[in-house]
Regions:
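N-terminal helix-loop segment corresponding to the beta1-alpha1 unit
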Residues: 2-190
Length: 190
């Protein structure tokens, strides 16, 4: 069997991935699939004006730009749709996309997933064959958000990057998010 990125890119050309994830880990998974040739549609929160990271700009970035470098770094190659999944009209549009999708990537807290109609039970009724990749930081605490810096602290990484115990420092890269994204991508590819 041939290997390499061009082979995978060709293999995934017919794959439709829908992504509702935000920030870094979930969107990175979607971008990995876009890089491999899949068609990825990122659904952004219409109420919020899109993914919050669109506005996470450095002082060196053009304030008039519609997107930040941060947003661009994990959303390459995707199509974007603004939908309010709490609205019946937009939920119908979303469900129509899901009926033809192969995969859905999410990273919402359990209560938010319920409000947005993204529970596994409901998704099974919309598309029984849908592969659902979900990033969750704390399996035993479904309502606890898992931001990278929190996980760096809980895993001890912060204690390894500071100068001493009184001067702890966050790693300059969101390593936990990056690792989570790669793990989910690999799991979905299997």
């Amino acid at each position: 069997m041939p290997c390499g990125s061009s082979y995978l890119r060709h293999m995934l050309n017919d794959l439709l991935v829908i992504e509702t994830a935000g920030i870094l880990a979930g969107p990175s998974v979607g971008m990995h699939f876009a890089e491999l040739g899949a068609r990825v549609i990122k659904i952004e929160n219409k109420r919020a004006g899109g993914d919050v990271t669109r506005q996470w700009k450095l002082t060196t970035e053009d304030p008039r730009s519609p997107v930040s470098a941060y947003f661009s770094s994990v959303n390459w190659g995707k199509q974007h749709r603004l939908l309010d999944l709490r609205s019946a009209e937009d939920r119908a549009v979303f469900d129509a996309l899901l009926t033809t999708a192969d995969m859905l990537i999410t990273n919402h807290l359990a209560a938010d997933a319920e409000k947005l109609g993204l529970t596994r039970e409901r998704l099974r009724t919309v598309n029984p064959g849908l592969l659902h990749g979900h990033i969750k930081g704390f399996a035993d605490q479904p309502e606890r958000p898992a931001f990278d810096v929190v996980l760096q602290a809980e895993t001890g990484y912060i204690s390894m990057t500071g100068t001493d115990t009184d001067h702890l420092a966050k790693m300059p890269i969101a390593l936990i998010d990056v690792l989570a994204a790669h793990q989910l991508k690999e799991g979905l590819l299997l």
